[in-house]
């Protein structure tokens, strides 16, 4: 039962993010099948662009969504090989300093609601992207296409 609740919470988080991304008029696709049948939560702008090797990899963005990070954040590392920096949205307040350092080394950019940033170690707060900055980042890339 606990796993079903966690799964529902994860799906609910994805649906909330979809609503935000649609409101921001972002182009995205969910559950795109990538290498080795992996399915990142969100690919910006879409799966066709991801699979088109003439489309610049710099204009692709991958976002994983996890209600909590724990060790599961590593799942996003190999979900989209064309995209070197992965973005990870979480609702978890305060990830450990060691885990943040590992994420940073693995080129994972943490994305959280802006009010949550204060719960993270001060030395990493400037590396964490507020959700509103992330949507602006995606929009800026998409406006150049």
Walk through the language-model features, giving the residues of each.
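Short, well-ordered alpha-helical microsegments
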Residues: 71-73, 96-97
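Short amphipathic alpha-helical segments and helix-helix/interface helices
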Residues: 18, 76-77, 100-101
């Amino acid at each position: 039962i606990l796993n079903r609740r966690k799964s529902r919470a994860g799906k609910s988080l994805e649906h909330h993010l979809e609503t935000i991304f649609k409101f921001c008029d972002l182009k995205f696709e969910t559950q795109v099948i990538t290498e080795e049948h992996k399915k990142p939560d969100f690919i910006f702008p879409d799966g066709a662009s991801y699979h088109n090797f003439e489309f610049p990899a710099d204009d692709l963005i991958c976002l994983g969504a996890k209600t909590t990070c724990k060790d599961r954040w590593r799942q996003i590392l190999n979900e989209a090989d064309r995209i070197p920096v992965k973005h990870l949205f979480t609702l978890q307040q305060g990830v450990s300093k060691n885990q943040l350092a590992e994420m940073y080394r693995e080129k994972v950019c943490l994305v959280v609601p802006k009010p949550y940033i204060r719960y993270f170690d001060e030395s990493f707060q400037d590396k964490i992207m507020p959700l509103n900055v992330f949507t602006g980042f995606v929009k800026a890339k998409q406006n150049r296409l």
